[in-house]
């Protein structure tokens, strides 16, 4: 697959060329299905001459240009020596992949369908019988494309990188285990969002995050101005080792949820009003004063709330140093939480994934579908950009932005 990408001048550079990626994925699936279709026609698979019971044989491929809503794509159509094979998936005079066919093919991946579901799908749509093991081999061809995407070059500087985790169950060595998929979503200096990477792991640690940070560095990221996280274990140490100047903002909304989840119903409204005086304060000095007042009022009943805010204040209070527009950008991890919600919509019917690879394939394709709509930038980006240039002037001088 890597050779295929190089030979056809397909290079995944910045994650935005979604149409090219979609065409390539459709081409891979169609060509795999056509080869399997010819196998069934001849009664034996390629190079399996022991089971050959016909005088007919394969005779290379012909190229056919198919029109799709993602643009034109070349498909290699297999031929037989006797000229008896008539492809059913792509008819002889068909030169367009219909919208329905495109959606069905891509939905087999992006909706996390099982190989059995896809087998039924192909039979229902095209009256083609393909075994689930064959479908697995075909879908596995997408993995090198995922690897290319994970290793693509990135921007030199990101204004903000959001880090979060989403959890799934995966079958591993006969057991069902919990896997965390760690997602890095960046906003570059032009205000454009991009998913920088998705990483499947078992648990958070400084070593794990260090490998991710080094990976971003190796892909060309020289600086991250601000990193927004949800209290991820080991992350502050890892990013300090690779990007020592990056400022860390812990998600305020997560902090509120985590610190108030055991507050009684009768107290929650008044307590939240007092807590809002802390995180919505105009300055850090005012916020600290309000935090002490909160302690005086509530510490006897809910001592863990003050302690949690006090212990994490260094990363919770970062946003106070920025102007209002930048505060709104980093105040919460809403940008990545919204993306995660869309992923969950796709995966909600899949309780257990058969492997890490199947999980990553599905998330990648869902990501391609979601991010194709990310064509613009925030409406207030002009104001944010101006403020970032002033605040981070020394770090941005000489950068190729």
Residue ranges of model-derived segments:
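Short, conserved DNA-binding cores of transcription-related domains
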Residues: 1-93
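Electropositive nucleic-acid engagement tracts
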Residues: 45-48, 52-53, 113-160
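Basic, short loop/linker segments at the boundary and entry of helix-turn-helix/winged-helix-like folds
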Residues: 53-111, 127-140, 156, 206
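RNase H-like nuclease fold core
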Residues: 78-81, 89-93, 128, 141-229, ...
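Metal-dependent DNA phosphodiester-chemistry modules and their immediately adjacent helices/loops
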Residues: 86, 259-287, 293
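Conserved beta-strand -> loop -> alpha-helix junction used to position metal-binding or nucleic-acid-contacting
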Residues: 226-233, 238-274
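Acidic/histidine-rich catalytic cores and adjacent linkers
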Residues: 244, 277-401
């Amino acid at each position: 697959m890597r050779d295929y990408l190089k030979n056809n001048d397909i290079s995944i550079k910045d994650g935005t060329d979604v149409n090219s990626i979609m065409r390539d994925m459709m081409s891979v699936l169609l060509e795999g299905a056509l080869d399997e279709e010819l196998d069934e026609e001849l009664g034996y698979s390629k190079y399996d001459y022991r089971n050959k019971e016909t005088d007919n044989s394969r005779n290379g491929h012909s190229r056919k240009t198919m029109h799709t809503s993602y643009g034109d794509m070349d498909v290699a159509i297999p031929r037989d020596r006797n000229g008896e094979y008539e492809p059913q998936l792509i008819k002889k005079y068909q030169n367009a992949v219909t919208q329905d066919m495109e959606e069905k093919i891509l939905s087999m991946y992006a909706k996390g369908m099982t190989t059995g579901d896809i087998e039924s799908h192909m039979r229902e749509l095209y009256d083609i019988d393909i075994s689930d093991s064959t479908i697995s081999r075909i879908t596995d061809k997408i993995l090198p494309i995922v690897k290319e995407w994970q290793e693509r070059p990135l921007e030199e500087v990101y204004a903000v990188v959001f880090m979060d985790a989403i959890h799934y169950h995966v079958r591993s060595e006969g057991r069902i285990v919990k896997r965390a998929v760690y997602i890095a979503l960046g906003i570059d200096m032009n205000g454009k969002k991009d998913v920088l990477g998705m990483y499947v792991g078992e648990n958070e640690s400084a070593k794990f995050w260090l490998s991710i940070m080094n990976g971003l560095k190796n892909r060309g990221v020289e600086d991250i101005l601000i990193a927004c996280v949800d209290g991820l274990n080991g992350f502050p140490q890892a990013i300090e080792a690779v990007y020592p100047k990056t400022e860390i903002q812990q998600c305020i909304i997560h902090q509120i949820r985590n610190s108030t989840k055991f507050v009684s119903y009768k107290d929650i409204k008044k307590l939240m009003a007092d807590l809002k005086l802390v995180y919505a304060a105009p300055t850090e000095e005012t916020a600290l004063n309000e935090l002490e007042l909160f302690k005086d009022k509530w510490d006897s009943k809910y001592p863990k709330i003050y302690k949690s805010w006090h212990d994490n204040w260094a990363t919770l209070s970062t946003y106070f140093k920025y102007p209002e527009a930048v505060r709104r950008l980093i105040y919460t991890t809403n940008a990545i939480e919204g993306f995660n919600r869309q992923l969950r919509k796709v995966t909600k019917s899949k309780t257990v994934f058969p492997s890490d690879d199947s999980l990553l394939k599905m998330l990648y394709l869902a990501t391609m579908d979601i991010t194709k709509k990310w064509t613009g930038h925030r409406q207030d980006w002009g104001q944010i950009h101006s403020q970032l240039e002033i605040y981070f002037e020394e770090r941005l001088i000489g950068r190729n932005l």
